[in-house]
């Protein structure tokens, strides 16, 4: 997205790049790295939190729960909405084909519980969305629903899943409502057709 915004590369499909597009992208990143653009490359959740909380970096790619963890320390860390849009990703649960009998029944019970609302409410307070929106919203307070899903200012403090304050009354969530945020997804993370080539080139970038 940076390369395209700068006019360096025009992609046919950023979510499924060609080998030529991958080559051009990695070449761009290697030059940026050699020019001192990047402070660090985090390898764990805690490392990403510490880099931001310490002030060692001021902008980075982060998971939403990591942003929440930084905010619990009283630091105003936010996802900055970009005019180019967001990079989106999602995950889901699936059952193994060999399950049968009590194991299959137990797996379905777990899926039912997972989608019943508690998990959706928990991850909402980390900044994530559940695929089952209605049950997730039902597990939140009116204030939390307004803040996380509806783009409304908080009417009271917003807290993390473990109770630490992350936002004050009057704050609005970065990016707006559920609908507004999803409407701005410009590319979805997925397994590209040229994934093996991409992995090899990414290793070149790491080693540069």
What does each model-found stretch correspond to?
Residues 1-3, 26-30, 49, 53, ...:
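Non-transmembrane alpha-helical segments in soluble domains
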Residues 1-9, 90-96:
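Periplasmic solute-binding protein
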Residues 19-23, 43-46, 54, 101-105, ...:
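Soluble non-cytosolic domains of exported or imported proteins
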Residues 162-208:
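Conserved C-terminal helix/tail region of periplasmic/extracytoplasmic solute-binding proteins
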């Amino acid at each position: 997205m940076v390369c395209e915004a700068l006019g360096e590369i025009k992609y046919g499909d950023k979510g499924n790049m060609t080998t030529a597009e991958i080559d051009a992208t990695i070449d761009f990143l290697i030059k940026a790295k050699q020019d001192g653009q990047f402070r660090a490359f985090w390898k764990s959740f805690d490392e990403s939190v510490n880099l931001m909380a310490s002030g060692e970096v001021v902008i980075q790619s982060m998971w939403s729960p990591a942003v929440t963890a930084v905010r619990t320390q009283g630091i105003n860390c936010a996802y900055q909405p970009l005019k180019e849009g967001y990079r989106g990703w999602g995950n889901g649960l699936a059952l193994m084909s060999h399950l049968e009998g009590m194991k299959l029944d137990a797996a379905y019970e777990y899926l039912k519980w997972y989608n019943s609302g508690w998990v959706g409410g928990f991850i909402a307070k980390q900044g994530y969305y559940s695929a089952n929106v209605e049950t997730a919203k039902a597990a939140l307070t009116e204030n939390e629903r307004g803040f996380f899903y509806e783009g409304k200012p908080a009417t009271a403090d917003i807290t993390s899943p473990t109770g630490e304050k992350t936002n004050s009354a009057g704050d609005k969530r970065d990016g707006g409502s559920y609908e507004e945020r999803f409407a701005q997804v410009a590319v979805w993370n997925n397994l590209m057709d040229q994934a093996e080539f991409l992995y090899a080139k990414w290793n070149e970038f790491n080693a540069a």
